[in-house]
């Protein structure tokens, strides 16, 4: 086996021969990362990406200055979807090592699950993987129900059934109950709702290849909230939380839904489909109805929902929407504590009325007259949250996945958002 390359940290600048902008230098003993105190975690992550680019696949994090956050920053940049990498971790105290191990187990699960090809990961497989992950960290404190196919239609989950019926792989709703109290009557503290579209062709509003080639990742919201619940459990979550994953393929077939179809939801809302590529909100609506019925203190939904959020924020931030200023502030504080990028975008009462239909109460997409696509999508979802003005957060997961590598990240999933949501759940 190749000897490990030693990676050490220094607060001194690199030798002048490396240039004044050098963030790392190479010597006979290995590679030194030169921290400047401005953005040390980002510097470590970017350096790790460069080290991986050199073809170095076995490293040892050595010397002083390493902690769980710095080790994790290195791994975020070093990990990539192709090939294998080995890291020999530094000595950490028990709490720091446990934190690092939990991140490696759970957030790597999120990244690997999002990166999985759609042929391998259908709606049923996604739901089962989520059950397996949560059960692994919570054992006997978890119960769950999986509803699929025609049972969804019979039980009134019309959004999920409508979107998923065009695929040979049946749509699936996972309802998972994490109840550490052991009391079946214990109140539900929070509900997490995730969009789990395991492949999104756009349906009859078909995507171009350039927009479809990454759509195996359209279940990123479901993976993120699953990982968040698992991670919160490892951090000692002692309150009851329910997880709802709305899983389906959005494909074209003789049985697929069409423009002009009208969906009637269990809360009485009627929605006209005018864009089959705005399917995420249609499946999330079913999950939000179930979440509202639990009367929790908070509901958090996460979805790779709109291109508009990516237009606004790129792949660098998750977009946050809420009518509840206090709760939004708490999530942003959690994001700051976890060093994860979130940015709040506008959501106002008027966005709820910017989806007019001539044939139903709501249209599932905006129009040229109302171009704020990410905000109107959030406004659409609010119609399925019973008390939408309090206790509800919507996360449009624009930072979940990168089609191409950048200086800090390989191509593929990032795992961003897991720690922030877990932090909020355990605060």
From Swiss-Prot:
SUPFAM superfamilies, alphabetized: Zn-dependent exopeptidases (SSF53187)
Cellular component GO terms, alphabetical: cytoplasm
Record-annotated active site: 207, 281
Top-level enzyme category: hydrolase
Subunit text: Homohexamer.
Protein name listed in UniProt: Peptidase B
Positions of Mn(2+) 1 binding: 200, 277, 279
InterPro entries attached to this UniProt entry: Leucine_aapep/pepB (IPR011356), M17_PepB-like_N (IPR047620), Pept_M17_PepB (IPR008330), Peptidase_M17_C (IPR000819)
Catalytically driven reaction(s): Release of an N-terminal amino acid, Xaa, from a peptide or arylamide. Xaa is preferably Glu or Asp but may be other amino acids, including Leu, Met, His, Cys and Gln
Family: Belongs to the peptidase M17 family.
Pfam families (UniProt xref): DUF3663, Peptidase_M17
């Amino acid at each position: 086996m190749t000897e490990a390359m030693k990676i050490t940290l220094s607060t001194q600048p690199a030798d002048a021969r490396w240039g004044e902008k050098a963030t790392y230098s190479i010597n006979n003993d290995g590679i030194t990362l030169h921290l400047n105190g401005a953005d040390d975690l980002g510097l470590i992550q970017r350096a790790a990406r460069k080290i991986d680019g050199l073809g170095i696949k076995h490293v040892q994090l050595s010397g002083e200055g390493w902690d769980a956050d710095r080790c994790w920053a290195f791994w975020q940049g070093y990990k990539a979807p192709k090939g294998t990498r080995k890291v020999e971790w530094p000595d950490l105290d028990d709490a720091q090592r446990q934190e690092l191990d939990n991140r490696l187990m759970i957030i790597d699960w999120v990244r690997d699950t999002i990166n999985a090809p759609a042929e391998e990961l259908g709606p049923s497989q996604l739901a089962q993987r989520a059950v397996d992950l949560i059960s692994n960290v919570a054992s006997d404190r978890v119960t769950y129900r999986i509803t699929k196919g025609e049972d969804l239609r019979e039980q009134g989950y019309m959004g999920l059934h409508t979107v998923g019926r065009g695929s040979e792989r049946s749509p699936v709703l996972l309802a998972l109950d994490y109840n550490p109290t052991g009391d079946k009557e214990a109140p539900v503290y929070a509900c997490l709702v995730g969009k789990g579209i395991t492949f999104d062709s756009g349906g009859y509003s078909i995507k171009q290849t350039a927009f479809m080639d990454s759509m195996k990742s359209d279940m990123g919201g479901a993976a993120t909230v699953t990982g968040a619940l698992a991670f919160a459990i490892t951090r000692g979550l002692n309150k009851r939380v329910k997880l709802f994953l709305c899983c389906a393929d959005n494909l074209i077939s003789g049985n697929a839904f069409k423009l002009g179809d009208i969906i009637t939801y269990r809360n009485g809302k009627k929605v006209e489909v005018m864009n089959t590529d705005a399917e995420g909100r249609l499946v999330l609506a079913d999950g939000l109805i179930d979440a509202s019925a639990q009367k929790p203190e908070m509901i958090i939904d996460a979805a790779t929902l709109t291109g508009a959020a990516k237009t606004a924020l790129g792949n660098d931030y998750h977009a946050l929407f809420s009518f509840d200023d206090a709760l939004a502030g708490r999530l942003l504080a959690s994001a700051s504590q976890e060093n994860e990028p979130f940015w709040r975008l506008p959501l106002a009462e008027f966005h709820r009325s910017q989806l007019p239909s001539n044939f139903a109460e709501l249209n599932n997409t905006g129009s040229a007259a109302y171009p704020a696509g990410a905000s109107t999508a959030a406004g659409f979802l609010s119609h399925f949250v019973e008390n939408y003005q309090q206790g509800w957060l919507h996360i449009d997961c624009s930072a979940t996945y990168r089609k191409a590598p950048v200086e800090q990240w390989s191509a593929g999933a990032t795992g961003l958002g897991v720690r922030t949501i877990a932090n909020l759940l355990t605060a």
